[in-house]
């Protein structure tokens, strides 16, 4: 792509921030995004709770690459390319499970859960140290690391250390991990669906507090119309640029949170349990942090495409573009391991009824994003989208657009080929752009 073409325009003097709609429709831009962003950044691949004992595994597609993530016999979690080093066949064709060995169906090579080649038909016709020398082992992903239970991979061996990359987002991953003394865990099941829109529209939407009242009016009306579905909290809060393209909105809201914000519809039994959870949070973390954990909602973006919605349930969501106007979405529910059946019931109900592909919110959002994508057919004559709301403010509200500007500023540093003015925090270098 011609780097002289501006896809992001920032006018600090006139408080204007615009994004070229060409970036949502261009095949050339998409190719650059895979090369310069998805091939260089840290990407979410799983959670440590999915690996409880040696041999536990999941297979995931991350940035078009099929990966096998396993717990080895030494209880270390490893990530490998899910392709046989012999001829390339997929080694593991199951989504998850437990197996000490993985056998390629094509020629029968067998690999241990640590990725090492254990046996092969006709091994006497290979050199003596073919197995022991490692020539036939599964190939590990260049970089793998874990932070606060969240597992990340990078296809760039030179990527900076994960804690440095996460910058200010570390605090929010740590916060989620502290909800439970016994640990947080991914619950059974995965939400999978597709959206006929550009992936960056879902980035914007996921951290957009501006659209809630209008787009999700049906859900808010539903809460109002059922008996005691609302608390007295108002929709209000702030947005924060966390550095390196990461951002968060943190806000109060009228719905209940199993950790640990009660609403009357949950009944007195539920109130007793919620009160106990809250009291334990105070004991462990102090009253100020307990209030933040219990009563504040958070929509967190970790650049480029990990969203953690810590609202009426906790959703971990990733999405990858298949075309400029098409993406695949995967979502998982995260919950305290010790959570009672009662609390888990309400958590999963919230996970489905608001955040699920058949719930109140996601169909609204999908319709909105696909409508935007359809509107981009006019991009040559209506070339710009505006993301200026709240520019120039010392503190941005949750329904301002600082958080989107943080994403787009970082995106432009990768795709535009040169640093741009930052949106409020000191620029922290990550992967070399040369």
Curated annotation (Swiss-Prot):
Reaction catalyzed: p-cumate + NADH + O2 + H(+) = (2R,3S)-2,3-dihydroxy-2,3-dihydro-p-cumate + NAD(+)
Tell me the keywords, alphabetical order: 2Fe-2S, Aromatic hydrocarbons catabolism, Dioxygenase, Iron, Iron-sulfur, Metal-binding, NAD, Oxidoreductase
Q: What induces it?
A: Induced by p-cumate and repressed by CymR.
Q: Which family does it belong to?
A: Belongs to the bacterial ring-hydroxylating dioxygenase alpha subunit family.
What region holds the Rieske domain? 43-153
Which organism does this record belong to? Answer: Pseudomonas putida (Arthrobacter siderocapsulatus)
Question: What PANTHER family has UniProt attached to this entry?
Answer: 3-PHENYLPROPIONATE_CINNAMIC ACID DIOXYGENASE SUBUNIT ALPHA, CHOLINE MONOOXYGENASE, CHLOROPLASTIC
Pathway in which this enzyme or protein is active: Aromatic compound metabolism; p-cumate degradation; acetaldehyde and pyruvate from p-cumate
Query: Could you tell me what the cofactor note in this record states?
Result: Binds 1 [2Fe-2S] cluster per subunit. Binds 1 Fe(2+) ion per subunit.
What does the record list as GO biological process?
catabolic process
Q: Does the keyword Repressor apply?
A: no
Name under which the protein is recorded: p-cumate 2,3-dioxygenase system, large oxygenase component
Tell me how this protein assembles.
The p-cumate 2,3-dioxygenase multicomponent enzyme system is composed of an electron transfer component and a dioxygenase component (iron sulfur protein (ISP)). The electron transfer component is composed of a ferredoxin reductase (CmtAa) and a ferredoxin (CmtAd), and the dioxygenase component is formed of a large alpha subunit (CmtAb) and a small beta subunit (CmtAc).
Q: Where, in this chain's numbering, is Fe cation bound?
A: 211, 216, 365
Q: Name one Pfam family in it.
A: Ring_hydroxyl_A
The encoding gene? cmtAb
**Listed cofactors:** [2Fe-2S] cluster; Fe(2+)
């Amino acid at each position: 792509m011609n780097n002289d073409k501006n896809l992001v325009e920032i006018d600090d003097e006139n408080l204007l921030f615009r994004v070229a709609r060409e970036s949502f429709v261009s095949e050339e831009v998409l190719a650059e995004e895979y090369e310069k962003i998805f091939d260089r950044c840290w990407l979410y691949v799983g959670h440590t709770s999915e690996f409880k004992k040696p041999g536990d595994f999941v297979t995931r597609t991350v940035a078009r690459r099929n990966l096998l993530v396993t717990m080895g016999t030494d209880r270390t979690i490893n990530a490998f390319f899910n392709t046989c080093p012999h001829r390339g066949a997929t080694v593991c064709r199951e989504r998850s499970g437990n197996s000490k060995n993985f056998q390629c169906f094509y020629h029968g090579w067998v690999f241990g859960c640590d990725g090492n080649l254990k046996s092969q038909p006709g091994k006497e016709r290979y050199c003596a140290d073919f197995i022991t020398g490692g020539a036939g082992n599964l190939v590990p992903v260049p970089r793998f690391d874990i932070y606060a239970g969240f597992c990340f991979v990078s296809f760039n061996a030179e990527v900076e250390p994960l804690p440095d990359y996460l910058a200010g987002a570390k605090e929010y991953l740590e916060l989620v991990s502290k909800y439970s003394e016994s640990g947080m865990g991914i619950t059974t099941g995965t939400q999978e669906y597709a959206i006929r829109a550009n992936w960056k529209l879902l980035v914007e939407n996921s951290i957009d507090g501006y659209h809630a009242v209008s787009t999700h009016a049906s859900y808010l009306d539903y809460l109002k119309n059922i008996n005691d579905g609302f608390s007295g909290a108002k929709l209000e809060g702030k947005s924060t640029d966390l550095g390196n393209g990461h951002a968060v909105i943190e806000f109060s809201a009228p719905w209940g949170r199993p950790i640990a914000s009660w609403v009357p519809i949950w009944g007195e039994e539920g109130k007793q349990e919620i009160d106990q959870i809250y009291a334990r949070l105070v004991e462990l973390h102090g009253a100020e942090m307990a209030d933040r954990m219990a009563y504040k909602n958070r929509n967190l973006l970790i650049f480029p495409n990990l969203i953690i919605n810590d609202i009426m349930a906790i959703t971990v969501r990733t999405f990858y573009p298949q075309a400029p106007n098409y993406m695949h979405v995967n979502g998982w529910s995260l919950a305290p391991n010790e959570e009672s059946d009662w609390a888990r019931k309400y958590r999963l109900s919230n996970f489905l009824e608001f955040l699920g592909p058949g719930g109140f919110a996601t169909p609204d959002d999908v319709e909105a994003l696909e409508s935007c994508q359809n509107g981009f057919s006019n991009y040559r004559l209506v070339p710009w989208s505006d993301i200026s709301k709240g520019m120039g403010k010392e503190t941005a509200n949750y329904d301002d657009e600082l958080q989107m500007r943080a994403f787009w500023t970082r995106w432009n540093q990768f795709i535009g080929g040169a640093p741009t003015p930052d949106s409020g925090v000191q620029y922290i270098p990550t992967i070399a752009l040369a």
